[in-house]
Amino acid sequence: YGGNSKKGFDCSGFTQYIMRHHGYNLPRTAQSQGDTYSKIKSSEARKGDLVFFGSSKKNISHVGIVSSEKGSSISMIHASSSKGIMISNIENNSYWTPKIQYYARVVKD
């Protein structure tokens, strides 16, 4: 944990970096980012929202940024420890879907 440069992001370092460049200061860890923002339903998720993964709502281990338009299959951009920055489809995905705990909105209308 702790990577937050262009050469070595971890997931929450990546979300923190991207959001900072849009004027939002996120906490450092995935868990603290999830604890900070208002939860939303998956059906309300839109580009720019955060999606949190883990074994429970109190044990968040990964975060990504929704990169798909509302109404389309949900995808995220995120930092993978093994593959770097990537886009992954998380809807009906055998790896990601079971781990989704919640979505949260940082950028208000």
Locations of the language-model features?
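Structural motif
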Residues: 48-49, 65
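Short beta->alpha junction loops/turns
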Residues: 4, 56-57
